[in-house]
Every structure is written in C-alpha cells, then in structure tokens.
Amino acid sequence: MKKYNSIICLILGIITSYSLLFEITSKGLKFGRSNTMMLTYLILAIFLFVFYNKYFNKFKGKMTYRVISLIFSLLMVFGYSYDVAGNSSLVFGSVSIIIFSILKMIGYFVLFNTAIHLLNDIVVKKKIKDEKLPKILSLFDKHPFLFSFIVIVICYLPYIIAYYPVIINYDAANQIKEVMGIHTRYMDSVVLLNPNVYITNFNPIIHTLLIGGLFKVGYLIGNVNFGMFLYSIVQLIIVISVFAYSIYYLNKIKVNKKLILIILGIYALVPLFPFYAMTAVKDVIFSSLILLYCIKLYDIMKYKQTTKQYILFSLLVLLIILFRNNGIYTIVLSLPFAMILKKEIRKPILIIFIFNIAIYIGYNKVLLPSLEIANTSIREMLSVPFQQTARYAKYYGDEISDEDKKIIDKVLGYDDLGERYEPDLSDKVKNKYNKYTTDEELKEYFQVWFKYLLKRPGVYIDATINNVYGYFYPNTSAWYIYTDLNHKLPEAGFDYHFNGLNGLRSILSAYGEAFPYIPILGTIANIGMVVWIYILLLGMLIVNKMKKYIVLLLPAFSLILVCIVGPANTYFRYILPCVFALPSLILILYNELKTRKEL
C-alpha cells in the first residue's frame, strides 16, 4: 500500500511540475529544453514527490477546500488563456489542447488541495508563544496606539518629503478643476441641471469639496502646493490613525504580540501603504473607512455595544456611503447579514441601516438636485453590456443588421464602436455614451443586446472575462502605485509641482516597483492573490464552523463584485480597500480561531 501511494505521489509530482513549468500555445506545449530548464523540472518534480508523499494522504479531505482548490485550478487555466490569447482557445482550441489543459488542472488541483489542507492544519494546531517584548518595545504595551502612530509616521516621512505636496491622479485633478470652476470631461458625460454648476457627482461630492476646498485655500494665499499639502496632512492623519487603531485593537483583543508587530511592520514598510497615503485619490480615505468598518463589525458580532458605540458606528456607515459612490453596496451587502447572523443586534443595526439608507436617498434624490448638482451617468453601471456589444461589433459586425446598428448608434455611437473596443478597459466605449439617451432607446438597445447574446453567447462571455480575469488570476499584473507628477493642473495654469528631490523619488519609486516581486510579502500587491486570500479565508471560516464571522469578509466581496461590473481589468485602486483591511482581518480571524480551539 505504501509503495502504491509513493507511485501515485510520484505521478502527481510530475503532473504538477508540468502544470507549473509548461506553457500551452496554439501550436502545442512550450517548454525550454536547456539543461537548466530540464534540471529545474527534475528538482521541482522530486520536491513535489517528497511533499505529496508526506502530506497528500495525511489530512481528511474537506469538501469546502476541494471546491476552492477546483476554483483556483480553473482560474489558473482559464486566466492563462485569456491573459495570453484574449479568449478560451488555449483551453478548448483543439483536442490536444483540451487534454493538456485537463492535465494542468489536475496538477494545480492536487497542489492547491494539499497546500490548503496543510495550511489549515498549521493554523489550527501551531502555537506561537507570546514572549515578553524587548525593553525598547515595552512602550508598545503601554501606548499601543501612540507607539504605532509614531512608528508609521517615521516610516512614511521619506515619502512625505519626497512627494511634497502630494501625488495627484487624473480624477483628483478634475475634482480640483470642478471646484475651481473649470470645465471637465465629467460635465460632458452627464445632463447638467445648471450649466454654471461645475461640480458633478461623478466623484463623491464630500471628497471633491475636501480636496478642491483645500486646494482653493492654497490658491487664495498664492501657493497651491501648500493647499495640496494641507490635503495630504488630512489624509495622512486619517490613514495612519486607522492603521494605528487597528494595531491598538489587535492588542486589545489579545492577539499574539509578535504577530501584531508583523502587521505594524507591514503597514509601515510595505510601499503601497505610504504611496497611497501620499496620493490624492478618493479611494484612500474610503479604504481606511472600510478597514475601520471591518474592525467594528467584528466588535459588534463579538461584544455587547453601548448606545454611544452604535451612534459612532452609524456615523462610520454614513461616511462610507458619502466617500465613495459605490459605498452603499458595501453597506447593503453586509449589514443585513450581520442582523441575520446575530439576533441580539437586529434592532439597533436595523435602525442604523434604515437611517443611513434614508440619508442616502435624501442626499441623492433631494439635496443634490436642489443644489443643481448633476448625478453620475448610468453609463458607469453598464460597462459589461457595452463591452459585449463593442466586442461583437469588432469581430462580427457584419452580422448586425442595419436597423440594429441604428439602435446601437443612438446609445453608443456605432461607426467606430469596434475600433474603440479595448478588451480590458471600457472607457473608450462608454465615454461615447449618449447622455440624452431616453428610457425607450435604452430599452431598445437591451432588446438588441439580448438578441445577439442568444446568437453568440461566447462573444459576450469573452468580453466579460477579458474585463475581469485579472482580479482572479495571480499570474497577471499591472501598475499598482502612482509615482509621477500629474500634468493636468499645470496645464490648467496652476503651479503644482514636486520639489527637487528627484533622486529620493527615484529610490522610493524603484522600491515600490520592485516590491511585488518579493516572495510572500509581495503578494499583497498582487490583485489576484488578494482575492484568493479572501476566498481562502471564507473557506477556513466555513470549515472551522465560524460562519458568524463571514460578515467580516462581505465588505471585500461586495467591492470585488463592483470590480466585476466595473470599467477596468486589474485596476489596483479599485481593490485597495480589500488590501487595507486584509492584514488586520487575517489576525482578527486567526485569533478568534485560536481562542475557540483553546476553550
């Protein structure tokens, strides 16, 4: 029996090595035949044989983990095909390719299933001693918030100095221009209620007023850089305070101090955190609020709350709704489940939920119209069908009737629709959306859309996957931090500029760009891996009978859903709230698991 298991493990090791090292192409398999590559394959196969021989039959298989392993395997195989070919041809292209793909899936599945079961075993059984901290760190015990705040500030200082006054992205530049009364592309995308009102709800109004208002302060005193630095100070205080509070809270619930200090190190030293803390973009404050929201959700699910705590929580919910236009979805997809999973909190949470929904409706349907502020365009919600139509027009435009082309033209403009199609970005397609489209014209468009869905569903599937696969496939990458000066404000006549520390900026930028390639730690800058970790956390909560705490993951999953229907593939700032919350969430859930196992 033992010999039989060893043979099985050897075969699985060979198959998994094939999965990791061989590439499928339209012409067959691709593998380097150099001595180095052959040696690599041999070493990997031997390592995996030893690994499987030790762990493959050690654990009683959990169905949840098998399902997750299957999902991860499918994501690897299909993600590769869409990343390389833009369709599923490297999965279903021919009989031989199908066989190669199935073998790859088997190899991935065995590896993921074994590794996940091993990880669960380590998490459940491994004990980490909470040793006494060195004297220099004894201050952490006495003042965890202040200690963490100061450490993070010190680590962020090089970024604050190098990127004074602040890094600005494209949206932030336009938000500032709105406040300064300068025409922006947002005005072209919406039906204006008053042509003299330049502010729109394309970006959250509260953030537009914050960044634009502080910029205007600088403008009025003759130094726009100072105004932007005021904004960076506000944002830095918010971000660092939330990070420090998360460390304080982890210490409060008695998480192992070694692990807490590791998380402090991550928030202080991983470059994406200081880079975004110094980047004026709406997602940063929102991401900090989401981290705080996840912590408070756990606190509510775990401990009895006072009236004051519920009031503060309601204020937090309101800020989430106001600081991101899609923040409402995070609340709607998480708070009701908290009520379902813990009946003791149903009344106060229901009151908070109804109150904030009412505020949201009143804000969007009453306050903004009364101020003649135009709401965002419906086109922002229609990236998926618009991309599907554009892909159909690009590859099968000759199949679309003249009558249907006229219907599409009323909504999207048909003549150059196929040329505007980009598989991983819908901006060029949706930016030509006719803002005066009537409900009847939109209805006719969707009738045409549905007609061609039935005719070629594969085209629609390809269009959708091309626009989202990067959120689930770890082997693809894109930019993830802002490092350059945005020229939109200088072009508008404002003296926004960086200082002369080009060398320091080059060093920090190089560190930021290199970080994703650091083993293990770099995964936090990989969108696909971040999503995988959340899926894995979900599985571990189910397996270890901690379903009540699934609610802590719902904010992240709601944001991932928004990414799926969003305009861009592998867009890091869209997933930023999930990244901000992840380190603290891992320790909160780990601590809850260890506490339960020790009872």
Please place each PLM-identified region on the residue numbering.
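Transmembrane signal-anchor helices characteristic of membrane glycosylation enzymes that use polyprenol
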Residues: 12-23, 69-82, 142-168, 355-368
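Membrane-interface anchor segments at the N-terminal boundary of transmembrane helices
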Residues: 27-42, 226-230, 466-553
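Transmembrane-helix motifs of polytopic, lipid-linked glycan transferases
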Residues: 110, 114, 230-254
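Membrane-proximal lumenal/periplasmic loop motifs of glycosylation machinery
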Residues: 162-169, 180-238, 279
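Short acidic/glycine- and proline-prone juxtamembrane loop motifs at membrane-interface regions
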Residues: 170, 275-285
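Membrane-interface alpha helices of multi-pass inner-membrane proteins
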Residues: 310-324, 335-336, 353-360
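Membrane-proximal stem/loop segments at transmembrane-domain junctions that anchor or position
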Residues: 371-499
